[in-house]
Amino acid sequence: SGSGKSTVLRYINGLENTDDGLIVVDGMPLDDNRKNRLEIRKEVGMGFQSFNLFPHMTVLENVNLSQMRVRKKSKKEAKTMSMEMLDKVGIAEKANVYPAQLSGGQQQRVAIARALAMMPKVMLFDEPTSALDPEMIGEVLDVMKDLAREGMAMVCVTHEMGFAREVSDWVIFMDEGMIVETGTVD
């Protein structure tokens, strides 16, 4: 806690400015150019500790919303993509229920489906299992393992070391705002 891991994700997503250095996402530099920042945000999905689902909307409506607002998809197109992504994370049968009717693990899978429905090139995860009961952690990690097997580029802040070893190509260890060690999982 407090080592700067979440801040790094905010830098990558262009939500905070760096003091030095350069971040490149899919060949596009993340700099002071507002247009670049907006374009990069369209290509980056984010999974947070808290699920940030709208409580007054069904699961399907939550997953549809950003597709229709940001990607300008029709409701029909959004629904097709939403159902595909809800199926991918194993929760399509809950499309017409409200977030309060779901477990924490189910809500996190809906949040991941919502991010994936935007067809990001990179997924950022900020401790996606930290707010979950121990029995719910596995179902979220399984979804993330599937994404890794499919080749999704991911940056994941996690305390789940076994998971990190299993799915990572590269690991960064941080302490007190500094990168202490980097390398392959080997």
Residue ranges of predicted features:
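ABC family nucleotide-binding domain
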Residues: 1-185
